C-alpha cells in the first residue's frame, strides 16, 4: 500500500473519513507539489480528511547543541508546509535529546517554541507525543508546554508510551495541552473488553 492508496482503503475498507500520515513513508516527497496535490486529490475524491503528519527522522528538537537543534527546527519546516497544503491541523514531533532532564527540557522549550512560532504563521499545530526518552514522563512534557504557552503547541498523549509511570496520571498531566489522543489496545475477551 502507498500513501496514494491510503485514502481509498481508509474509506472503502474501514469506513473511516480521516487519516494521519507518517513522514517516513514519503520522506522525499514533502516538497513535491505534484505528489502532494495528487494525495490531496485522492483524499477529496474519497471524502477523507488529512489530520496529522507524524514527523520522524528530522533531527532532535531537544538537542542540547544549538546548531543541531537549529537544523532540526529547519528540517521540520517542509512538513509544516506539507501539512498546511494537505489540510492537516498538526504535525506530530518528538522531543528527544541527550543530556539531563533539565538540559533537554530547556532545549525542548527552545526548539519546540521556535518551531511552533513558525508553524503558527501557517495555521498548524506542533504536537509532541510522549514517544520515548524524557517525553515519556508526563510531568516533564507538561512543564515544557506550560513554559512555551502557545496555543498551537500541544501534546498527543499516547496511553502506551509512559515509562514506569502511571499512565493515567500522565494522561491527566498532558490532556490540558492535547490536540489529539493516541491509544493502544492489545488483547480482548469475547465481549470486546481489553
Task: Label every model-predicted segment.
Residues 50-52, 92, 128, 157:
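Hydrophobic residues in well-ordered beta-strands that form the structural core
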Residues 18-19, 109-194:
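Acidic/histidine-rich catalytic cores of soluble enzymes
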Residues 1-85, 103, 113, 120, ...:
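N-terminal pre-domain/capping segments
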Residues 23-25, 56-59, 92-99, 132-134, ...:
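Active-site-proximal loop/turn and secondary-structure-junction residues that shape catalytic pockets
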Residues 80-103, 122-135:
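Active-site groove signature of glycoside hydrolases
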Residues 36-37, 69-70, 98, 109, ...:
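Alpha-helix boundary/capping detector
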Amino acid at each position: 500500500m502507498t500513501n496514494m492508496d491510503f485514502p481509498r482503503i481508509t474509506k472503502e475498507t474501514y469506513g473511516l473519513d480521516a487519516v494521519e500520515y507518517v513522514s517516513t513513508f514519503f520522506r522525499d516527497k514533502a516538497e513535491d507539489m505534484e505528489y502532494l496535490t495528487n494525495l490531496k486529490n485522492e483524499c477529496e475524491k474519497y471524502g477523507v480528511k488529512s489530520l496529522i503528519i507524524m514527523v520522524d527522522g528530522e533531527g532532535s528538537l531537544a538537542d542540547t547543541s544549538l546548531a543541531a537543534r537549529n537544523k532540526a527546527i529547519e528540517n521540520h519546516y517542509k512538513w509544516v508546509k506539507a501539512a498546511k497544503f494537505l489540510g492537516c491541523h498538526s504535525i506530530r514531533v518528538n522531543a528527544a535529546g541527550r543530556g539531563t532532564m533539565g538540559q533537554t527540557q530547556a532545549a525542548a522549550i527552545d526548539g519546540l517554541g521556535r518551531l511552533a512560532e513558525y508553524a503558527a504563521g501557517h495555521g498548524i499545530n506542533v504536537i509532541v507525543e510522549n514517544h520515548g526518552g524524557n517525553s515519556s514522563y508526563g510531568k516533564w512534557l507538561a512543564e515544557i508546554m506550560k513554559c512555551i504557552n502557545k496555543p498551537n503547541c500541544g501534546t498527543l498523549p499516547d496511553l502506551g508510551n509512559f515509562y514506569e509511570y502511571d499512565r493515567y496520571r500522565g494522561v491527566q498531566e498532558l490532556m490540558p495541552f492535547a490536540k489529539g489522543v493516541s491509544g493502544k489496545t492489545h488483547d480482548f475477551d469475547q465481549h470486546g473488553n481489553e
